[in-house]
UniProtKB/Swiss-Prot annotation:
Encoding gene, per UniProt annotation: ATXR5
The EC number(s) this enzyme carries: 2.1.1.369
Name the record gives this protein: Probable Histone-lysine N-methyltransferase ATXR5
An annotated GO BP: methylation
Gene Ontology CC annotations of this record: chloroplast; chromatin; nucleus
Length: 374
C-alpha cells in the first residue's frame, strides 16, 4: 500500500506545481505608444466656423485699402467677419456672391502643385498612338490636291476653321498639359472634353438646336472634319499650344505658348449641361449659354464647376473700357453640330506667343458684370 500512497502524493504535487505555473501573474503589458497630436493650425483649418454677427456694420472698412466707401462693393468674410472691396481682393471678385464667401486668408488656398508625367497622362486619359500623323494639315489643305470635275461656279469665299498646331517638343506639350491639370486639380475639377449630361440636370434630348429662338448656324461638313481632327489630336496628347498661368489679380488665365493663326479652333466649351432655371441662384462664375429657346424653361447653360477643360480659364474683356475690345483675340461661337448645340472658342486674329487670351463674355447676352475686369 505504501508505494500507492507515494505515487498519489507525487501526482498531487505535480498538479499543484502545474497549477501554480498556470496561475502565475503575467508580466505587465508594454505601455501604449504616445498619441500623435495634430497641430492647432490643422485643427482650425478643418473645424466648422461660426460667425458672431455684429449689430451694426456701418463702420466696416476694406482691409486692403482701408476705405469704407462704396458699401455696395464691400464683401464680408463669413469666417473672420472682415470687409474687402470686390476690386481689392486678389483675385478680383467680379460679382457679389449669392452664397457664403471667404476671404483669401480664410479660404486656405493651396499652392498649385506640379504633377508628374504619369499623373498628367492618367489625368487626361491620353491614348498611345503608334503611327505618326500629320498634325498641321487641315481638311482644306487636303482638298487642294483633289481633282475637280464639272463646271466652275464662282461663289463667295467662306472662312473655314483651322486646326491648332501643337508644339513639336513632347516636353513642352507635357508642360502645357501639366499647367491645365494643376489648375483643374486646384479647383477640384475633372477633365472633360465633352458636354456631360448628369442625372438631376438637363437630359441630352433637351439639347436640340431647333429649339433656338431665331435658329442657329450649322457647322459645315469641312469644319466638322477640323473639329474631329482636333479632338483626335487631344486624345493622343497633341494639345493646343496654351499655358494656364495664375495671375494675382485675374486668377487663372490662359497664354499662348506658340503662334496661333486667325480662325484657329482653340477649344470647345465643356461641362455639365443644365437648365438655366436651375442655376438662377448659382455662384459658378463660368457658366456659358448653350441654348436660348423660345420657351425660357428650355434654355440651357454649360456649367464647368465639376468638370471642364481649358476653355473655363480663358479671360473676358472689360466691356466698360476703350481698351477692352483691343485685348480681344478670340470669340465664342455657337453652332448646330448634328442637330445639337455646341460652343467653340476660335481665334479672331493672329495670336503671338506669350499673349494672353481674351474674349467677350457678353457676346450673346449682356448679363455678365465686367466692370471690375482688368
Amino acid at each position: 500500500m505504501a508505494p500507492a500512497s507515494i505515487t498519489t502524493t507525487t501526482t498531487v504535487a505535480r498538479r499543484i506545481v502545474g497549477s501554480r505555473r498556470r496561475t502565475k501573474a503575467t508580466s505587465p503589458p508594454d505601455s501604449p505608444p504616445p498619441k500623435k497630436l495634430k497641430p492647432i493650425s490643422e485643427i482650425l483649418a478643418k473645424a466648422q466656423y461660426a460667425v458672431v454677427e455684429r449689430a451694426d456694420y456701418g463702420d466696416v472698412s476694406c482691409m486692403q485699402c482701408g476705405s469704407g466707401e462704396r458699401a455696395e462693393e464691400l464683401l464680408l468674410c463669413d469666417k473672420c467677419d472682415k470687409g474687402f472691396h470686390m476690386k481689392c481682393v486678389r483675385p478680383i471678385v467680379v460679382r457679389v456672391p449669392i452664397g457664403s464667401w471667404l476671404c483669401p486668408k480664410c479660404s486656405g488656398q493651396r499652392r498649385v502643385r506640379r504633377l508628374s508625367q504619369r499623373k498628367i497622362i492618367d489625368f487626361f486619359r491620353i491614348q498611345k498612338c503608334n503611327h505618326k500623323t500629320d498634325k498641321c494639315s487641315s481638311p482644306q489643305d487636303i482638298r487642294k490636291h483633289r481633282r475637280r470635275s464639272g463646271s466652275l461656279v464662282y461663289q463667295k469665299r467662306r472662312r473655314r476653321l483651322l486646326p491648332f498646331v501643337s508644339s513639336e517638343d513632347p516636353a513642352q506639350r507635357l508642360k502645357q498639359m501639366g499647367t491645365l491639370a494643376s489648375a483643374l486639380t486646384e479647383l477640384q475639377m475633372e477633365f472633360s472634353d465633352d458636354l456631360t449630361y448628369s442625372s438631376g440636370m438637363a437630359p441630352r434630348s433637351a439639347n436640340q438646336a431647333r429649339f433656338e429662338e431665331g435658329g442657329m448656324q450649322v457647322l459645315t461638313k469641312e469644319d466638322i472634319e477640323t473639329l474631329e481632327q482636333c479632338r483626335a489630336m487631344c486624345k493622343r496628347g497633341d494639345c493646343p499650344p496654351l499655358l494656364v498661368v495664375f495671375d494675382s489679380r485675374e486668377g487663372f488665365t490662359v497664354e499662348a505658348d506658340g503662334q496661333i493663326k486667325d480662325m484657329t479652333f482653340i477649344a470647345e466649351y465643356t461641362g455639365d449641361v443644365d437648365y438655366i432655371r436651375n442655376r438662377e441662384h448659382d455662384d459658378c462664375d463660368s457658366m456659358m449659354t448653350l441654348l436660348l429657346a423660345k420657351d425660357p424653361s428650355k434654355s440651357l447653360v454649360i456649367c464647368p464647376d465639376k468638370r471642364g477643360n481649358i476653355a473655363r480659364f480663358i479671360s473676358g474683356i472689360n466691356n466698360h473700357t476703350l481698351d477692352g475690345k483691343k485685348k480681344q483675340n478670340c470669340k465664342c461661337v455657337r453652332y448646330s453640330v448634328n442637330g445639337e448645340c455646341r460652343v467653340f472658342l476660335v481665334a479672331t486674329r493672329d495670336i503671338a506667343k506669350g499673349e494672353r487670351l481674351y474674349y467677350d463674355y457678353n457676346g450673346y447676352e449682356h448679363e455678365y458684370p465686367t466692370q471690375h475686369f482688368v
